[in-house]
């Protein structure tokens, strides 16, 4: 019916839209789907599923379409981010190590305490055992925009939340999902889940 295409952010890009993509899949045009760059334009936001009266999961088809592309030919940026996340148990797509993360968090926290007296008692715990919340953080903040971590700390502090980061599994992003690399996607999720379990936290709060 085309409802899926009406609200799709990627509709019309590369002469493709969700309805056309679905029809191609129905007609068995796997080679054409795999050759189309549109599988990488789709953000898999699920808006088409919400609009579809039959609730057809087009993003799942997009995911399968991505898997038809040889791994080395998938988009270089997210491919490298996936591979980088596999180098450390931090799961950071920017390659930040456990030591890097701890240094940045402690340095930024010290500055906030010194310059903002109303937050002199604020904490940004790392590896606190049996905290209620295990909080993930996107790698971009500690690596390139460390001050952007502070608003979340303030919210958690003012809410009286019992929370912690972990030196392992702290990175919130998972580019292996977007590259449609299921084994490594699962590896990263399991690494993060183990970090939560090892600290005895009750809730994994993924900020992505």
Question: What residues fall within each predicted segment?
Answer:
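Ferredoxin-type iron-sulfur electron-transfer modules and their immediate structural context
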Residues: 1-41
